[in-house]
């Protein structure tokens, strides 16, 4: 009887096994298309809101997507993305549901125009965030490419 109680206590107190959970992150430029490789991508980081633990991260890469599909609107629940549209794909191991925050910073190739957005959602073990567009964020801002001087150059006073 004592052995059964001990085994029961061990089973109840044993940590849940972590389940691989896929997450896809896409970033739209406000009023425009996906931010992808042509703009240097967008840095993304996933972290646990309660502990601050960084769970995964990387760079959104791919094409800017289908202009007609993105700009033409869509019925509720239909994806904006198409095959090859810019995305970051990762897998995190979750033993329990966690409140996850994604931090997105970009466009990487335009440092003078970089901005950061964050979003939070509960993610369940084994129940990925991949349906349709996955975790879709919108990045506000405007990129202006000055031809002369280039964005990384500075003018001397009086010129």
Describe each model-derived feature in a short phrase.
Residues 13-15:
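N-terminal signal peptide c-region/cleavage motif recognized by signal peptidases
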Residues 18-25:
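Cleaved targeting-peptide boundary
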Residues 36-43:
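Short coil-to-beta strand junction motifs in C2/discoidin
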Residues 43-47, 103:
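Beta-strand signatures of extracellular beta-sandwich domains
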Residues 94-115:
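Short acidic/polar inter-strand loop motif in beta-rich domains
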Residues 122-159:
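Short, compositionally biased P/S/T/A/G/V-rich stretches that sit at domain boundaries
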């Amino acid at each position: 009887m004592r052995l059964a109680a001990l085994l029961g206590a061990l089973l109840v107190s044993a940590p849940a096994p972590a389940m691989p959970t896929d997450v896809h992150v896409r970033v739209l430029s406000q009023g425009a298309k996906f931010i992808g490789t042509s703009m240097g991508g967008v840095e993304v980081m996933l972290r646990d809101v309660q502990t601050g633990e960084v769970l995964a991260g990387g760079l959104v890469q791919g094409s800017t997507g289908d202009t007609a599909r993105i700009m033409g609107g869509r019925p509720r629940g239909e994806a904006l993305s198409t095959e090859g549209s810019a995305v970051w794909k990762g897998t995190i191991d979750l033993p329990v549901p966690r409140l996850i925050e994604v931090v997105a910073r970009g466009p990487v190739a335009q440092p003078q125009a970089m901005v950061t957005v964050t979003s939070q959602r509960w993610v369940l073990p084994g129940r990925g965030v991949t349906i349709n567009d996955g975790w879709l964020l919108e990045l506000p801002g405007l990129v202006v490419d000055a031809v002369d001087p280039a964005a990384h150059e500075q003018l001397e006073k009086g010129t």
